[in-house]
């Protein structure tokens, strides 16, 4: 064993016997096992595609619900756009409510809603991957569609409550206290909204209390992302504006959405690790820890697609002689997953 490996194994032994670093490494390892980067990228893409239809739909619905109250309509819309640093101003100038007859508006609104539902499907898929739900146990199209509509309802309610709370804090306080109070209220509301959304997206058999730890962390992080997102995006676009011109706005939006997606996936991974006690994980294998075997078994059983299909997983010590069993790398004598 070379000195580098000796040092790494010493670090591995240390983290496995310390709860906090073991949990952190467990979350990071599970993020990798579940291909969390790919899930975050999918959420970013579908979130980007759904953004304009959702804003058009929001503006149109507000036009009906708050008819005769243009000030309140703009307040809610501006509150939604304020969550998008830098590009919020450009969106505000270009997003307008649909116009036309009642039937045309209804058809247009339904079309926008259907176009935006992709993000809800991806979020449900991400939660199923994080909790390693076998394919055979995942809901069909119509239950997923109903969950998607419920998610939009929860988000709309959160937006209205957030706008009302921000208005109350702004009217009751002024200056720096108003800013600090607004951030605290935003963190609390984001935590509650995150918990409500996770409850909608996560399989029913997962208890609500298991969803709370990740939301307690994600809520304030979303507030930080909203409050200081402009600085992050400005850093990202320092040179992109001259090179890409208008597309720099798209780059800024994608960067912001990807950070939000990563917070979401990491929060869900933290919930799964804490609820299922998926730590300590090994940094160097072999040997595998009990948590390693539990995660790898869950990932393998996740591939069950039919009720007639049953996946079993077994583990052995050390490497296989010759890298395979008697019948070759995929033969029946292979002692790996069956």
Residue ranges and their predicted role:
Residues 1-338:
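Membrane-embedded alpha-helices and immediately adjacent juxtamembrane helical segments
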